[in-house]
Regions:
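N-terminal secretory signal peptides that target proteins for export/translocation
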Residues: 1-11
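Bacterial N-terminal signal peptides
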Residues: 15-26
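Sec/Tat signal peptide C-region and signal peptidase I cleavage site
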Residues: 28-32
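Acidic, serine/threonine-rich low-complexity disordered tracts
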Residues: 33-104, 130-239
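Surface-exposed, glycine/proline- and aromatic-rich loop segments on solvent-exposed faces
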Residues: 90-92, 98-123
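Extracellular/luminal beta-rich ligand-recognition
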Residues: 119-129, 133
């Protein structure tokens, strides 16, 4: 039986090397341990199976921080049928914040998740000077070994539906904690539900208290960075 992490990498041969590495999330350890429930939810679930193309999903994006100015933006996922296959084009943020993500010719998992993680990893590199491969490894290990999966009700377009929340703290037990001391308690939360279009309701990375933002008269030593991406609409409306 093919391990899921290797399987995901094989399904997207045209997505680009960086995206394939992120999708694999540890294919090198595929024979060492089974796929965890968190990995199954995030990377082995066909989030787009219930969507009818063409369709466009829109997500809001909000960043709050005391390190640098926050901002609000949006993420758009455009789906189309090409030669009987579902293709996906992801526009992850706009302007100076735009993250380039390769188009997928045969999409199964929701690429918004990949865009969010690639964005976060790039930000960690920018803020700390660390290696993107190291941050990917920490996230991979946390999903494989230390993720918490809980039931969580959510409200989408006025309706309460059941969801599952996956939470990880990749740097809490980091052997290189001395270098990334300020980021030890950074928490990632992924909220998924089969009852919302695209399967992903909300993605969040949080460090510190998001209500504490930078001001000219109130400097804060400990970094506070909160980034939240939330599904707001799909067009045309899905059955």
């Amino acid at each position: 039986m093919t391990n899921g992490r290797v399987f995901l990498r094989m399904r997207l041969p045209c997505a680009g090397a960086a995206l394939a590495v992120l999708l694999a999330l540890g294919a090198g350890t595929a024979t060492a341990q089974p796929v965890s429930p968190a990995e199954t939810l995030l990377f082995e679930t066909d989030h787009l199976a219930r969507l009818k193309a063409p369709a466009t999903l829109v997500y809001s994006f909000r960043k709050e921080s005391n390190v640098e100015p926050g901002f609000k933006d949006e993420v758009r996922l455009e789906l189309a049928k090409v030669n009987g296959k579902l293709s996906a084009t992801l526009h992850f943020l706009t302007g100076e914040h735009k993250q380039e993500i390769p188009a997928l010719e045969e999409a199964h998992g929701n690429p918004v998740l990949l865009g969010f993680l690639e964005h976060d990893i790039a930000e960690m590199k920018r803020l700390t000077g660390g290696s993107t491969s190291y941050f990917r490894k920490r996230i991979r290990m946390a999903l494989a070994e230390g993720a918490q999966v809980t039931l969580q009700p959510i409200t989408y377009q006025g309706k309460t539906v059941q969801a599952q929340a996956v939470r990880i703290q990749p740097y809490l037990n980091d052997p290189m904690h001395a270098r990334f001391e300020k980021y030890l308690r950074k928490t990632y939360t992924f909220v998924l539900s089969e009852q919302v279009p695209g399967g992903l309701y909300q993605l969040q990375s949080s460090l510190g208290k998001p209500e504490t933002v930078r001001t000219a008269t109130k400097p804060v030593d400990a970094p506070v960075i909160d980034e939240t991406l939330t599904l707001i609409s799909v067009t045309p409306k899905q059955p």
